[in-house]
Each structure stands twice: as structure tokens, then as C-alpha cells.
Amino acid sequence: MGQTIITNDGRFEWDEVKNIQNIEKHGIDFNFAIKVFDDEDKIEEYDDFHSTYNEERYRVVGMVDNDILFVVETELESGRIRIISARYAEKIYVDKYFLLRGKNYDF
């Protein structure tokens, strides 16, 4: 496990080694991915399949700079959000985002 990075506002954290691996694999930096939480139309869902007794995980799908991102996170006892992974959303989640929000794909 690498160094834990905490954002200046204390709202988010992540493992920096995991962030570097995520950038290499998906091309998304966690510092960029946290902007998904600013999207008022974001979709947040409990991830029952990947959650455990010790860690509840959530999927967040939202728009950042005209791209739809898929972020996996967990909420810590402190209230801070820990980013686990981030990638560009697959078509099924892009479709769901626009369908639920009544938006067009034109951007």
C-alpha cells in the first residue's frame, strides 16, 4: 500500500500507488475523477457485489468535462470518501446516465 493522499478540503482520499496504477490502466487520475461528485445529475448506487462486511462500496456515474466517468468509492467512518478506482463509463452506464437524467447525447 502506498502513501495516502488527502485532498486539501479533506473530503477525499486515495492510495497514491493505486492512483498511478489506475492512470496506467484507465487513463484517469483520481484527482480528476473526484469532480464526478460535483455533477448534480450523478448516479450513486450501492455495489452489493463488491461490498464486504468491513467495506461498503458505491458506484458513482457522472459527467466531468463532457465525459461520463464510473468511479468506485467507499465512505469512511470519518465521513471522508476513499476513491478505489475510476474509468470512463461503459456504454451501459452512459445510456443509464442519460436515460435517467432525460438528457441528450449531444455535447
Give residue ranges: language-model regions.
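Ribonuclease/tRNase effector modules and their secretory precursors
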Residues: M1-F107
